[in-house]
Amino acid sequence: MVLPDSNIMKNGSIKRLRDSQIENSPYSRPIKKITPNSSHEDLSATISNEGSLNFTPRTSRQESLYNMKKIFQKTYSQTKLGLFSSKKQVNTLETAIPTTPKQQLPTPTTSPEKNNILWSTPNSLTSLRTISNDLDDCRNRNLITDFSELSIINSSSSSIYSTQQSHPIFEIPEIVDNIVKQLYLIENEQDLLNGHHKKDVNRENTSTVVSCLAVSKTWNKVSKGYLMRDLKFTKSTSLTNFLSQCSTKKTTPQSLILHKMSDINNNNSRGLEIIIDPKQLRHLEYYVCPNILPPVNWFQSLTKLEKLILPGNKLINDSYLIQICRYLPNLKVLDLRACDNITDAGIVAVGTHCKQLVSCNIGRHRNGSSITGLSVVALAKNTMIRTLGLAGCDITDASMWELAQKCGKNIERLSLNNCNKLTNFSLPMLFAFNYFPNLNVLEIQNIAKITDVRHMVRYKIWKRSQRIPILIKGCDRITKLIHEEERQIKAQSLKTARKDMTLWVNQLENE
C-alpha cells in the first residue's frame, strides 16, 4: 500500500512532519539513531524505487523479528561456548539491521528491557562477565590440577601413614628438619610465655610436633628426634610405657625430668640406663623422687651437664656427691634442698670442682647443723655464686662476712630463713656498708635475733630511687618492723623538708 503524502511517509508520522518543517530552527528535534535498546517492530519498512515507503504486513514484521531472535540466540550460544568471534558478530548485526546514514527509524512504541538476552553481544556487560567467569573457572581448575600433589597427608585416611603420594619437596630431610624445628621452637616459646611446664612424653594430640609424626616416615623420624630432646615423666605408667616401647633404641635427650614419682625406685628404672645416652644431657632433674638416683656411670659422660636438680632425695649422700662432682666442670645450677644426708664434706667437694656454679640451694628443715660456714666459704671462694639458698642451715655472722667480702658484689638472691644464729652484727651491718649492691631478693623469715631493720629499709628506698625492684621477704614480726621503719623515715624526711623550706623563706625575708 502506497500512501499519498510523501512527506508524512518520509518522516514516519505527522509529528515528525511537523518537526521537519522547522528543520533549520535551533530548537529542532535531533534525528533518532539506532541503538541496541531501540524497538525494531517497524524495521520491515523498505524504500521503493519511486521514493515512497512500502510497509510490509504485520505477519511479515513478526517473521522478521523471529529471524532476528534466532540470529541473536545463536550468537549467545557461541559466546557461552567460547567460540564467539567479535568481528563475525558485528558483521552479523550489520547484516541483520542494514542502515544507512540517511535512514531514520520511527519512534518505538515501548522500550525493551535493558538486560534482554537478545542483546548479549561482545559489547555488552553481560557477555563480558560471562567470558570472565568462564576464564576464572578455567584458571581455578588448572591451579587445582597443578597443585593437587602438594598435599602432605590424606585427611580421609585412617592409618598413620597415608597411601597418597606426597610432593617430593616434603620428603627432603633438610627441609623437613627446618619445618619441624621451627614448630618445636614456637611451641616451647609459647609454653614459656604462658608459664607452662614442659609437657609429659605422652603428650596430647593437640601438640603440633606430635601431629607431624603421622605425616610420613621421614616426618616421623625427624619429629621423634625433637620430641626425644626433652623427656619429662610425671607418672610411673608413662615411664613404664616409654621403657617398654624403646627397649632396644638409644636416645640422646638434652633434658630428662622425673617429677614427683615416689613409687619409682632404682630397681624398676634400670631401663633408663640402657635407653638413655647421657652424652648430650644438659638438664637432669629428679624432683621429689626420694627413692631413685641417676646412675654414677652416667656422670662420666655428663661433661655438658649444666643443671642437676635432686630435691627431696633420701639416697644421696656425701660419697655420691664426691664421686660425681669431679665430672661436672660445666655445672651451673645445683639444687639439693631437703637432702638431709649431705654435709659440709659434699658441698666443699662441689665448690672445689664446679667452678662455673652460679646457683646452689642446700636449704633444709632437718639436720641443719650438717651445713655450716665451711660450705659457705668454699662456695664463696671457688665459684661464681649469685643465688644461694641456706635456709635452716647453721650459718653464723662470721660466715656471712666471709660471703660478703669474697663475692658480695655478685650475690643477687639470698635465702636465710630459719638461720637462728644470725644477729644484728651480720646482715644489718652489711647493708649499712653496702656489701650487697646487686641484691634483688632477700628472705629472712624466722630469725629471732635480728631486730634492727633500719639499714635494710634505707637500702630498699635507695633501690627504689634507682627504679630497681627489690623484695625483702620476712615473717610477720620482721614485716611489721620494716613497715614501722618506713613510716618513721618518711615522717623524718617530711620534717626535714619543712625545716629546710622554713629556713629558706626566713632568709629571703631578712634579705
UniProtKB/Swiss-Prot annotation:
Region (Disordered): 27-58, 99-119
Top-level lineage group: Eukaryota
Compartment(s) where it occurs, according to its Swiss-Prot or TrEMBL record: Cytoplasm; Nucleus
InterPro entries per record: Leu-rich_rpt, Leu-rich_rpt_Cys-con_subtyp, LRR_dom_sf
Pfam families xrefs: LRR_6
A GO-annotated cellular component: cytoplasm
Membrane spanning stretches: none
SUPFAM superfamilies: RNI-like (SSF52047)
Residue spans of biased composition, Low complexity class: 99-112
Record's keyword terms, sorted: Cell cycle, Cell division, Cytoplasm, Mitosis, Nucleus
Disulfide bonds: none
Gene3D superfamilies in UniProt: Ribonuclease Inhibitor (3.80.10.10)
GO BP terms, alphabetized: cell division; mitotic spindle assembly checkpoint signaling; mitotic spindle orientation checkpoint signaling; negative regulation of septum digestion after cytokinesis; protein-containing complex disassembly; SCF-dependent proteasomal ubiquitin-dependent protein catabolic process
GO MF annotation list: small GTPase binding
Chief location category: cytoplasm
Biased composition annotated in UniProt, kind: Polar residues: 45-58
Family: Belongs to the AMN1 family.
Function text: Negative regulator of the mitotic exit network (MEN), required for multiple cell cycle checkpoints. Required for daughter cell separation and chromosome stability. Involved in copper sensitivity.
Listed name of the protein: Antagonist of mitotic exit network protein 1
Species per Swiss-Prot/TrEMBL record: Candida glabrata (strain ATCC 2001 / BCRC 20586 / JCM 3761 / NBRC 0622 / NRRL Y-65 / CBS 138) (Yeast)
Lineage of source species: Eukaryota, Fungi, Dikarya, Ascomycota, Saccharomycotina
Gene: AMN1
